[in-house]
C-alpha cells in the first residue's frame, strides 16, 4: 500500500495522510470514545480518542511533575505537537495566549535574558508587550524555527475554535507588517528631523546558474517647519520684544521721577493786607498799655484824666509801621510763588525727559523686535510652504548580471509502487537570464514610484536555504528580494513541465502594491501550503498533487 506523496513525487497521486488533532478537537471530548471530525484549513481529520482529560492528565496541571525529568508522552497536549511548521495556541491564559490577546495577529520575537529566561516580545499600536515563556513553549518555538530567526507570527484563528496558530515569520509577513505600520496614521511627535538619511543596501543572489548582483543606494531627507532654525530665531525675537515691553513698563512705574504736585501760590495783596491789619492791631494794643500815649482830659478840679484815645503822633507811627509790614509780606508772597512754580517746572521737565528716553529705548526697540520677529515667522512659513514636497528621495540603482556554466543532472526517483520516474527536462539558462535581464531593465512611469514609501526596505530575503534540499522541479522564485527596495510588479507563470503551478514574482518596483496583491490572488500564487492569505478551508486538500515548496517561505 503506498504511503502517500510524502516524497514530493509528481507521478504519485496519493493524498497526504490525515494530520493529528488540534487541541480544539480534543478539549472536552475525552473519555467518551467518539471520533473527532474537522474540515479546517489543514484538511480532513477523522482520528483517535483524545488524550485530554484522561487519567494521565487527571490532575489538570503539571505541578506534580518531577523537575528535570521528561514529561510523560501521554501528558502532551495537541498544541505541543508541531504540524506544518506551526502549532496551535490554546486559550489557557499562558504566556503565548496572553501575548496573542495583547498584540493580535502580529509578529513577535524571542529573546534570551541574562538570567537565562526566554521572553517573547510583541508590539501593537506603539505599545510593547513581553511575556516570560515556559521551557515547553520555548522548545516548541525552537522546533519550528530550525534557522534560528527567533521571529514568529500569530496567524489568526486558523486553528479550531478560533485558536491562533504560531508559525515562523516569513519575509512576506515582515513586509506586510511594515505595510500596516506605514498605513497607520502617524502622531505629530513622530516627524523626522532635517537631513535624516536611510542607508545603503547591497544583496547578492545566485539563482539557477546566474549570479545577479544589485546595489541600491537610497537617500531620503525630510524636513518640517518646526525643525527650521529660522523659525525658532524669529520666535525668540518676538519673545525678546515682549519681555522688553514688560520691562519698560515696570521701569517707568518704579524708577522714574514721580509726577510733581501743582504749585501752591499765595495772593500778594491779600498777604499784605492781612499782615498790615495784624501789625496795626498789635501796635495799638501795646500803645494803650502806656498812659503817656493817650490824650488826657482836665476836669473842673484840674485833675488830668486819660481820655482813652491815642495821641495823634502815636497813631501816625503805628500806621506807618503797619504799612511797612504789609509791603514786606507782599514781597515775600511774590517770592514764594515764584520758587514754587520753578520747582514744579524743573521736576516736570525731568520726568518728561526720562519718559522720552525710556519710551524711545524700551518701547521702540521692543516694538521693532516684535515686528521683525513676526515678519520672520511669516517669511519662514511661506518659504517652507513654497519648498514642498517636504520629503525628497534620491535613488541610484546599479545592476550587474554575470553567467556561469551549471550542469543540471536529472534525478531518478523510484516510488513505492515500483514506477520509474523519467528525467525532468532541463531549463535553458540563456532564456532565463534573458528574461531576468529584460524584466529588471523595465521601468514604468507611474505615480506610485515617488509617492509610496517602499515597505520592503528593511526586509532581508534569502531564498536558498542551506537546510532545505534542492530539487530539479524549478520551483525557485526569481528576483525576489534582490534589493532592499523591491516591490514586485510583474508576474510570470512557469513552464508547463514543472509541478509548481504558482506564479513567479519578477520585475522592477514600479506598479504598486495593490495591483500585485490582486494579480497574485487571481493567479493562485497565494494559495500554497496552509491556505495563504486568500486560500479557503480546502486549499490543502486541493493541492495534494502539488506539494508546497520546501521550507517556510509562504504567504501568511
Swiss-Prot record:
Residues 252-362 are extracellular. Residues 1-44, 182-226, 257-280, 388-449, 531-556 are annotated as: Disordered. The keyword Secreted applies. Residues 182-205 have a biased composition (Basic and acidic residues). It comes from the Bacteria. Its main location: secreted. A motif (Essential for actin pedestal formation) lies at residues 454-456. The chain crosses the membrane at residues 231-251, 363-383. It is a multi-pass membrane protein. It is found in: Secreted; Host cell membrane. Residues 213-224, 257-277, 434-448 have a biased composition (Low complexity). GO terms for cellular component: extracellular region; host cell plasma membrane; membrane. Residues 402-422, 536-546 have a biased composition (Polar residues). Phosphorylated by host kinases. Keywords: Host cell membrane, Host membrane, Membrane, Phosphoprotein, Receptor, Secreted, Transmembrane, Transmembrane helix, Virulence. InterPro entries: Tir_central_sf (IPR037003), Transloc_intimin_rcpt (IPR022638), Transloc_intimin_rcpt_C (IPR022639), Transloc_intimin_rcpt_cen_dom (IPR003536), Transloc_intimin_rcpt_N (IPR022633). Residues 1-230, 384-556 are cytoplasmic. NCBIfam families: transloc_TIR. Belongs to the Tir receptor family. Interacts with intimin and host proteins. Multifunctional protein that is required for efficient pedestal formation in host epithelial cells during infection. The extracellular region acts as a receptor for bacterial intimin, allowing the bacterium to attach tightly to the host-cell surface. Simultaneously, the intracellular region initiates a signaling cascade in the host cell, which leads to actin polymerization and formation of actin pedestals at the sites of bacterial adhesion. This is Translocated intimin receptor Tir. It comes from Escherichia coli O55:H7 (strain CB9615 / EPEC).
